[in-house]
């Protein structure tokens, strides 16, 4: 039985926090469309679309009355958040984020998992390049904490129901409450 009152939900957090996993699970449980912003952003061979193109793609999907959006693209936050009813913020400790990123990267490299079409992760760049997801997580972790704390306290987002989880245990307890 679905007693969850919100039908437009944004799941946010740093890379490796579990946004896609949780958003996909929420969408399945609530029987809502799942929108993975990375899938809108990345083209073949890791070609990024322009901000304008991302905005057009995102605008098309969030026009609907119900969705679960996964992602942190600040260039479209002005589209997604005003339409959202709830934000789920996965604000987990940095060591856990890095551990999850490590496991996810190895799994994707070893299985050659396709991401957003034909893209696959390659070991060396993920660990040792300036485009490393690990480096990105380290660079953005504290900035994201400050950004979300600030954004979620702004009057224009006062109508959002915020679920702020600081550990996977908190998130799992919320999911077990039976509202979903």
Where do the PLM segments sit?
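Hydrophobic anchor at the beta1->P-loop junction of P-loop NTPases
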Residues: 11
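The conserved Walker
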Residues: 15
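Hydrophobic positions on the alpha1 helix immediately C-terminal to the Walker A/P-loop
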Residues: 22
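Conserved nucleotide-sensing/catalytic segment adjacent to the nucleotide-binding pocket
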Residues: 33-87, 92
């Amino acid at each position: 039985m679905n007693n969850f009152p919100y039908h437009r939900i944004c799941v946010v957090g740093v890379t490796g926090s579990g946004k896609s996993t949780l958003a996909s699970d929420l969408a399945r449980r609530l029987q809502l469309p799942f929108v993975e912003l990375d899938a809108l952003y990345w083209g073949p061979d890791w070609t990024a679309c322009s901000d304008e193109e991302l905005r057009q793609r995102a605008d098309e999907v969030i026009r609907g009355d119900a969705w679960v959006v996964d992602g942190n693209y600040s260039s479209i936050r002005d589209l997604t958040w005003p339409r959202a009813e709830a934000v789920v913020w996965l604000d987990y400790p940095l060591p856990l984020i890095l551990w999850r990123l490590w496991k996810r990267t190895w799994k994707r490299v070893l299985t050659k998992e396709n991401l957003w079409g034909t893209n696959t992760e390659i070991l060396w760049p993920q660990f040792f390049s300036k485009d490393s997801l690990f480096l990105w997580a380290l660079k953005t972790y504290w900035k994201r904490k400050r950004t979300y704390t600030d954004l979620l306290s702004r009057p224009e987002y006062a109508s959002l129901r915020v679920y702020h989880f600081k550990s996977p245990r908190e998130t799992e307890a919320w999911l077990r409450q039976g509202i979903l």
